[in-house]
Amino acid sequence: MESKALLLVVLGVWLQSLTAFRGGVAAADAGRDFSDIESKFALRTPEDTAEDTCHLIPGLADSVSNCHFNHSSKTFVVIHGWTVTGMYESWVPKLVAALYKREPDSNVIVVDWLYRAQQHYPVSAGYTKLVGNDVARFINWMEEEFNYPLDNVHLLGYSLGAHAAGVAGSLTNKKVNRITGLDPAGPNFEYAEAPSRLSPDDADFVDVLHTFTRGSPGRSIGIQKPVGHVDIYPNGGTFQPGCNIGEAIRVIAERGLGDVDQLVKCSHERSIHLFIDSLLNEENPSKAYRCNSKEAFEKGLCLSCRKNRCNNLGYEINKVRAKRSSKMYLKTRSQMPYKVFHYQVKIHFSGTEDGKQHNQAFEISLYGTVAESENIPFTLPEVSTNKTYSFLIYTEVDIGELLMMKLKWISDSYFSWPDWWSSPSFVIERIRVKAGETQKKVIFCAREKVSHLQKGKDSAVFVKCHDKSLKKSG
């Protein structure tokens, strides 16, 4: 807890100077003079994903042919975010390579606004309007000069770049097909009006990944509120597995706030790597589930795919446009491939135990036709007699069709005389499980008719019920 508190203090110091930067910008210029466009547009190739070797120059038609732009294919426009170094970050060529691997005949354009992006954050935040204006004028020129269909255009913006993409989409003559916001920046944009930030109106379809929304609104690195048609919050959107808070604090303590970018990079940049994962692992897309809150999701209450309640994360997302933004959640692994398998578990505790047990630790093991996943930890905030509890667990491997499960109640880490003298226990007759990825429901019965789950003792074993009446699921 102290580490988390220190992290928030550090971020607070870093963000304290951020004040709203109000820089107006006119609608995309319909004139033919493009000399004032400062952003550069590099068409990278599958052979050289790391270098800007050929630039498309608005107003110069020859530059488009010289770069071998494919007029019959999709175009991806990648817009980077704020930078401390003034150089491209390592994710840029990785995303370019993944896009080309998935769509070999496409055009992948990288927008260079590095000079504007390396200014003091509020200044760079204000520049997103100018960058968006540059991008819109470039797209409009391509459409007017070459009759290039904007239905083939997909903008991908990271951090501040997501808002630049939104501004661009709002200023094009026709709507572009899609904008993907990769953890859009929060400071200066959380309370901004739609014209100056990413919003659902900026493209035919807008999907957003939120991966670092830790902190109070307006001061979190990534924007917290939904800003697309579908907004996905992996691992609740606050912090990502594998991103070490303690290590980040140690780096800041040793090197100062100059390395604050290292603090935000892991979770903030995870949005990009999740999207890259969706490009490279198309056969096994991660599944996200619509839910009113991350708390409800953690209880396993949202693993439904009825009426578009679930969707694929990333490139193969289903373009669902509801009147209100859909907030969706999922769990992920700490590294690629990020896909996990979600399960809702419902257990009814009965017996003669008096009172409530608070913050109780358990372990559950699942055994299937393909593999097994053992000793998955979970904690129930409270446990009492004659109540049913629902919670979410997930496995990092596909275990196939569920066959058996074990449940263990972990003893407290501290010594307790009552537990030593007589361990509390509950009676469990059956456990209900729903698999999110397959939507299958299974009821498990105690192997010995009823199972006595005792704290700190052996696991209780449950097998699939054979009574047909039980398979009507609940």
From Swiss-Prot:
**Which residue stretches belong to region Important for heparin binding?**
430-434
Q: Per the record, what are the reactions this protein catalyses?
A: a triacylglycerol + H2O = a diacylglycerol + a fatty acid + H(+); a 1,2-diacyl-sn-glycero-3-phosphocholine + H2O = a 2-acyl-sn-glycero-3-phosphocholine + a fatty acid + H(+); 1,2,3-tri-(9Z-octadecenoyl)-glycerol + H2O = di-(9Z)-octadecenoylglycerol + (9Z)-octadecenoate + H(+); 1,2-di-(9Z-octadecenoyl)-sn-glycero-3-phosphocholine + H2O = (9Z-octadecenoyl)-sn-glycero-3-phosphocholine + (9Z)-octadecenoate + H(+)
The annotated region (Interaction with GPIHBP1) lies at 32-53, 443-467
* Key words of the record: Calcium, Cell membrane, Chylomicron, Disulfide bond, Extracellular matrix, Glycoprotein, Heparin-binding, Hydrolase, Lipid degradation, Lipid metabolism, Membrane, Metal-binding, Nitration, Secreted, Signal, VLDL
Q: In which tissues is it expressed?
A: Detected in white and brown adipose tissue and heart muscle, especially at the lumenal surface of capillaries. Detected on capillary endothelium in the lactating mammary gland. Detected in blood plasma (at protein level). Expressed in liver, epididymal fat, heart, psoas muscle, lactating mammary gland, adrenal, lung, and ovary. Highest levels in heart and adrenal gland.
Covalent S-S links between cysteines: 54-67, 243-266, 291-310, 302-305, 445-465
Residue list for modification 3'-nitrotyrosine: 121, 191, 343
One CC-aspect GO term: cell surface
Record InterPro entries:
AB_hydrolase_fold (IPR029058), Lipase (IPR013818), Lipase_LIPH (IPR016272), Lipase_N (IPR033906), Lipo_Lipase (IPR002330), PLAT/LH2_dom (IPR001024), PLAT/LH2_dom_sf (IPR036392), TAG_lipase (IPR000734)
One matching Pfam family: PLAT
Q: Show where the PLAT domain sits.
A: 341-464
Q: Which domain of life is it from?
A: Eukaryota
Which positions bind Ca(2+)?
A: 194, 197, 199, 202
Leader sequence residues: 1-27
Citing just one GO molecular function, the answer is: calcium ion binding
PANTHER family (alphabetical): LIPASE, LIPOPROTEIN LIPASE
Protein family according to the UniProt entry: Belongs to the AB hydrolase superfamily. Lipase family.
State the function annotated in the UniProt record.
Key enzyme in triglyceride metabolism. Catalyzes the hydrolysis of triglycerides from circulating chylomicrons and very low density lipoproteins (VLDL), and thereby plays an important role in lipid clearance from the blood stream, lipid utilization and storage. Although it has both phospholipase and triglyceride lipase activities it is primarily a triglyceride lipase with low but detectable phospholipase activity. Mediates margination of triglyceride-rich lipoprotein particles in capillaries.
Protein name listed in UniProt: Lipoprotein lipase
Species for this entry: Mus musculus
